[in-house]
Design a protein with these regions (language model features):
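Basic, alpha-helical nucleic-acid-binding regions used in initiation and control of genome expression
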Residues: 137
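Hydrophobic alpha-helical segments characteristic of transmembrane helices
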Residues: 42, 52-53, 187-195, 362-366, ...
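C-terminal transmembrane module of polytopic membrane proteins
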Residues: 299-392
Length: 392
């Protein structure tokens, strides 16, 4: 509060007969971008807990403003209300886990809270900027220090530094991490399914006593020159629109699960049967000579693998509006690979090395018609089906 008083003597009592002027309140609100950032975290399955040195009433007001708690929720715990760590059992421990806001918390209590959540199976990220935050930043699975106002001790103890001191950056970083993880999965599944198809193609042709449908140098050409470009283009994807609407990945599970290996094998088998069917049609129905049939088989495998990259989109996304279709690098890679495949077919020196010949009009019609079969199957599955979970 503010008040005034006129005195004739400087030694007069300063606290009597004052004229009240008014109350002065200091407001230090959270940044406007924090609330939507917290909402994004919650949608992404990330639980946000506020630990502050402010008084409980102040912490509760900020928590309501940020949407962490409702006005009816009075669940704010002060440090003095928390029992010693070794005494926390049963209902007391459950109350701690349900609490969204902690006020007047001591540094040692921060360590205890982190330990409680970690033992509950949570991956804990901790933000901080002061020297007192350093032990908690070090103990957390991910310590996040402030880059502008953070102390050197806090920054050295952290795993990550927010250069802009902005909470909004955290969900952005989480999204980038999820996109990278998703792109790695796509890269591995695509490249391995293409390689599996090449292995199965030679294996099945051998046990069926068919002529070799693809030559060793042609396989090497596909691996080194063509399918590698779409694979790398997948790593530049921007992720699906619902990337932050999914729960976090279980850190105890491998990046490529048994289900992914199964899907890879299924894709490889579909690609193999398509190429083998094309080769059989060329030899037995169209009665094309072996040299030209091998070229048709080689080109079918090349185009099958190129169209197959479009099957790497996520489930239940739209055919023409998904993270793969709008990836401009995918289309550049497909265009470049088609150009290289045409060079391998028609460029005199290269075609001689790879033993390719002009497939002719009927050959091209067969190639283009058969090569889209795996794409059609994949698109139907991704649109109307769901991810296989055989080994969960």
């Amino acid at each position: 509060s503010a008040a005034r008083k006129k005195v004739k003597d400087k030694n007069a009592d300063p606290y009597s007969k004052l004229t009240f002027l008014g109350l002065i309140a200091l407001l230090d609100p959270a940044r406007i971008e924090v609330k939507p950032a917290i909402e994004t975290c919650i949608k992404a399955g990330i639980e946000v807990i506020m630990i502050t040195g402010d008084q409980a009433a102040t912490a509760r007001y900020i928590g309501i403003e940020l949407g962490l708690i409702s006005k009816e929720d009075s669940q704010v715990k002060e440090g003095k209300e928390i029992k010693p760590y070794e005494e926390l059992k049963g209902q007391d421990l459950e109350d701690i886990k349900k609490t969204k806001i902690f006020a007047r918390v001591e540094p040692a209590q921060k360590l205890n809270l982190i330990d409680i959540y970690q033992k509950d199976g949570s991956v804990v990220a901790m933000t901080g900027d002061g020297v007192n935050d350093a032990p908690a930043l070090r103990k957390a699975n991910i310590g996040v220090a402030m880059g502008q106002r953070g102390t050197q001790v806090a920054q050295e103890s952290a795993d990550m530094i927010l250069e802009d001191d902005n909470f909004e950056t955290i969900p952005i970083a989480v999204k980038e991490g999820r996109i990278i993880t998703d792109n790695i999965k796509k890269f591995v599944i695509y490249l391995l399914s293409c390689n599996v198809s090449e292995i199965l193609l030679v294996f099945l042709a051998s046990i069926l006593y068919m002529p070799l449908p693809i030559l060793p140098l042609q396989i090497l050409f596909l691996n080194v020159v063509t399918d590698i470009f779409p694979a790398f283009a997948l790593t530049a994807g921007e992720g699906s629109d619902d990337m932050m609407d999914k729960p976090p990945r279980d850190p105890d599970k491998p990046l490529i699960t048994k289900n992914h290996w199964f899907i890879t094998a299924v894709y490889g088998l579909v690609l193999t049967l398509t190429v083998l069917g094309t080769f059989a049609i060329a030899l037995n129905i169209l009665e094309i000579e072996v040299a030209r049939a091998v070229t048709i088989s080689f080109l079918t495998l090349a185009f099958v693998q190129l169209w197959h990259v479009l099957n790497m989109r996520n489930f239940n996304t739209k055919i023409f509006a998904n993270e793969v279709f709008r990836n401009k690098y995918i289309w550049g890679a497909i265009g470049l690979s088609i150009f290289l495949v045409l060079l391998a077919t028609y460029m005199p020196g290269l075609s001689l090395v790879l033993k390719t010949v002009n497939p002719g009009m009927e050959g091209w019609l067969l190639i283009l018609g058969m090569s889209i079969i795996p794409l059609i199957i994949g698109q139907i599955w991704k649109t109307f089906g769901k991810e296989i979970s055989l080994f969960s």
